[in-house]
């Protein structure tokens, strides 16, 4: 019996969520930033582009639809800025990637954090209304530990002082973030959302043993931050409805076709794969930077793994036979029925996007679909 069609995520031919912004969206956002386009005009441009994107996702045969993150500047910061008690600030520098620095923004705690009236709920309702038969609208948001990590950094003047004026301890901060996420998750569920994805780059940092060594972090320190990440993410998930699927995507950075960190999953697998209460892990495996499949032996029984074997960082199409072979290699550690396929990340984690064309983007999606049909027909 075919297992190609799934009732909810993960899907055999899946995506991470973001897509290249069309020029009309880029132009509208630039005009809005310049003060020559009002909020209504910006929303109209985004709405039109998202409708077109959803049509293309349907035409590609995807079971999942997203808004491509067209209403965001970043995959993570816009969500943080939408929480009560967190504000947008310019950082001293951008995030440092290999050969490139990102735009310079961060998130600063300025008051008690809560999740009421988050703008992403309205964003989701727009996509939900576009669902077709057998399709599921997905909402992607940064993982709770990602928000914790961002606001506890020292990326702009006064960031730490502002945080500690509100939350004296990390424990108080973590509790507040978890509660805020539970509010947003409940509101998304009430809006009809049945698939939420936590995007999480914190684990990519801990995979990079060279970077960790430079920070002076000890094995005990690594264990503590890993346990904190799992505990905070689980606290946000706690009490979710049974029919709400929450998955997570682990990334090593995806900005303008470059990356921030490298290293296999070995350091984090005993914590993340074994203990996080998500339904599935969306994992990068597109280059040797992500290591081998052996850490998948730590995946808890019954959990699902989406193999990110097709890169979004380059236009060249992967060899289908080679990808099929790698899927079967992964099946040595996770049963084939619990494996799925997707690109390694989104196509535009930030609005600048990766270095490929829209046609090349859709060719990647078509490749994922063809391979999934071969493996799970």
Question: Where do the PLM segments sit?
Answer:
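Domain-level signal for soluble alpha/beta catalytic cores
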Residues: 1-377
């Amino acid at each position: 019996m075919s297992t190609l069609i799934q009732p909810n995520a993960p899907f055999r031919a899946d995506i991470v969520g973001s897509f290249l912004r069309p020029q009309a969206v880029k132009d509208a956002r630039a005009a809005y930033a310049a003060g020559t386009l009002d909020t209504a005009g910006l929303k109209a441009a985004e709405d039109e582009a998202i409708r077109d994107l959803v049509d293309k996702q349907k035409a590609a045969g995807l079971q999942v639809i997203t808004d491509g993150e067209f209403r965001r500047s970043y995959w993570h910061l816009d969500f943080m800025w939408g929480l009560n008690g967190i504000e947008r600030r310019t950082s001293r520098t951008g995030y440092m990637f290999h050969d490139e620095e990102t735009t310079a923004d961060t998130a600063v705690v300025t008051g008690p954090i809560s999740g009421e009236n988050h703008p992403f709920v309205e964003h989701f309702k727009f996509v939900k209304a576009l669902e077709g038969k057998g399709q599921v609208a997905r909402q992607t948001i940064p993982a709770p530990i990602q928000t914790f990590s961002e606001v506890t950094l020292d990326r702009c003047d006064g960031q730490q002082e502002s945080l500690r004026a509100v939350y004296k301890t990390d424990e108080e901060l973590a509790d507040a973030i978890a509660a805020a996420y539970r509010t947003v998750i409940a509101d998304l569920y009430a809006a009809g959302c049945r698939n939420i994805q936590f995007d999480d780059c914190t684990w990519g940092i801990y995979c990079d043993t060279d970077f960790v060594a430079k920070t002076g972090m000890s094995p005990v320190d690594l264990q503590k931050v890993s346990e904190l990440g799992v505990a905070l993410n689980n606290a946000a998930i706690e009490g979710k409805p049974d029919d709400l699927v929450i998955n997570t995507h682990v990334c090593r950075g995806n900005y303008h076709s470059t990356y921030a960190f490298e290293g296999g999953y070995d350091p984090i697998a005993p914590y993340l794969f074994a203990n996080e209460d998500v339904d599935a892990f969306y994992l990068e495996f597109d280059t040797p930077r992500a290591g081998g499949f052996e850490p998948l032996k730590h995946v808890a029984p019954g959990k699902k793994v989406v193999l990110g074997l097709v890169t979004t960082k380059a236009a060249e199409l992967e060899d289908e036979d080679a990808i099929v072979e790698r899927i079967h290699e992964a099946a040595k550690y996770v049963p084939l029925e619990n494996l799925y396929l997707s690109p390694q990340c989104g196509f535009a984690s930030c609005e600048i996007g990766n270095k490929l064309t829209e046609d090349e983007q859709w060719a990647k999606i078509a490749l994922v679909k063809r391979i999934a049909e071969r493996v799970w027909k």
